[in-house]
């Protein structure tokens, strides 16, 4: 695999999934910048006032805390990892078997931008 991201994208995705599967938000959040911007259709549903854009690490912690309260059986299985110039995409299946792609942009080793995208069933 040719990776141009200055981190081991596969190792990152494994740590990311392990932290999520342990429901350990602080371990997930340690990889995120204080000024991170994150979008997700789930955020739009759980936090309608955000218009699906979560701004800042504190707001992201709040969103993910609420998400874990609503999805107590949350579990991710990484299917594939893609690396770009300053980005990785983690393709995974969630606890319902749904396919999700998480796009993460890095700067100085921290995620500054993230986007959760969900497969639209045909």
Regions inferred by a protein language model and the residue ranges of each:
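A solvent-exposed, acidic/Ser-Thr-rich amphipathic alpha-helical stretch
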Residues: 27, 33-79
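Short, low-complexity N-terminal intrinsically disordered segments enriched in polar/charged residues
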Residues: 1-30, 34, 110, 122
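A structural signal for well-ordered alpha-helical segments within the folded catalytic domains
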Residues: 7-10, 58, 98
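Hydrophobic pocket/interface hotspot
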Residues: 16, 28, 36, 56, ...
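A beta-strand edge to alpha-helix "cap/lid" segment located at domain peripheries
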Residues: 1-3, 67-122
């Amino acid at each position: 695999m040719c990776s141009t991201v200055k981190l081991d994208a596969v190792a990152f995705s494994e740590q990311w999934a392990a932290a999520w599967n342990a429901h350990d938000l602080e371990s997930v959040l340690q990889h995120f910048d204080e000024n991170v911007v994150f979008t997700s259709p789930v955020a739009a549903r759980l936090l309608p006032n955000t218009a699906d854009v979560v701004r800042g690490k504190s707001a992201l912690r709040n969103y993910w805390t609420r998400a874990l309260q609503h999805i107590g059986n949350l579990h991710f299985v990484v299917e594939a990892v893609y690396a770009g110039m300053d980005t990785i995409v983690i393709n995974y299946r969630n606890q319902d078997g749904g396919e999700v792609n998480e796009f993460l942009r890095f700067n100085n080793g921290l995620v500054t931008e993230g986007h959760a995208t969900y497969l639209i069933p045909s």
